[in-house]
Amino acid sequence: MQCVWTLSLLQLVALWANAAVLTENGLPILWDQAPSQLSDLPQADDVVTINPWNSLQRMSLYRILVGSTDKYMASMGTNDSASPLWGLPLQLAWKVRSGRLVDPTGATTCGQEGDPMCISTNSWWACVNYYLSVIPFLAAVQKGLIGDGLIQVQVQAPAEAAEDSCTSYTDCSAKYPDLMAKWEEFFQTLKDVSASEISDFEKRDQILGAFWAGETLSLNTASSSCKAKMSYYSSPEVAFAKSWMNAADYVAAAYFQSSLNNSVLFMGPLPSRVLQEGDSAPNIADLSTEENHTLYIFGWMNRMNTILLGSPVKMWRSAMCSDKAREKGRELLQNLILDPKFAVSTFVSILTEMTRSCTGLST
């Protein structure tokens, strides 16, 4: 078993060359330029105003969030890069670097060379990310993890994005009560669990469970709210977007620890550009072997889930019935997504056996 793990690590290290484009000096791109304190953002009369349609300001939400919650993450690992929240700025970094925040309609230059910090309100990817940035940030402020409780936070909402946006904690809670409550629950869990006497293993499992519950509901909310924006993209990009959402269900159920290093490894082989008509993995000439493989596997996972009416995802969730099962699930996903030599049939047979084991435990 140890030999297999060592080989797997060596294979993963080989992906760093591709993944490096998401980072600068080991941190997400734009991280060093993004404001690191609430007081660094524009404010007047004790009201901080955030423009989440600017890449630097949206990245600042994550920088402030990661910094403010780090003291509660000791159970995650021995350094400050182990927090699962690192996965969120890495997602944003990939979307920026791959051109997925650019106006897909071509009607404006938003996100292009002349206006690189602009996040287009027409971008499906930007819309989805909104629910993974603004909502968690406002929830953290409300729960007292960010700020001193005296400064209010306002969020800019462009007229063309008014329906998909909200301007404050009160406004966002009214529009998305269940989602805001789920993220508040995560931050409360973070505070409570970090102060408890349970083992670090148990703390980690509870924190990751609450984190992925928040991220899953954010994605589900975004799926319906952002759906119309998919019409701006090619059919291969739409198919990839749907498969990306489907893959998130597997990652969430396994309680993936989206630390800085883990997130870079898993996001490095995501496609480095928006897909166009005619792109068909695993034979897209200007994408790397790893990118082609990831696109192919994501597509296969989504096709199987569609053909079998959602039963593969349900089966996967059933198989993630214990902390040990989730640990095995994380390793299985790692092999499937990152190792081109790992057979799909092997994945299916192992998953089937894991499901049987869980069924046996529950009877």
Curated annotation (Swiss-Prot):
One GO cellular component term: extracellular space
Domain of life: Eukaryota
One matching Pfam family: Leg1
Keywords of this entry: Developmental protein, Glycoprotein, Secreted, Signal
Region forming the signal peptide: 1-19
Glycosylated residues in this chain: N79, N261, N292
Localisation per UniProt entry: Secreted
Stated role: May be involved in early liver development.
Annotated PANTHER family: LEG1, PROTEIN LEG1 HOMOLOG
Similarity comment: Belongs to the LEG1 family.
Protein name: Protein LEG1 homolog
The species this protein was found in: Oncorhynchus mykiss (Rainbow trout)
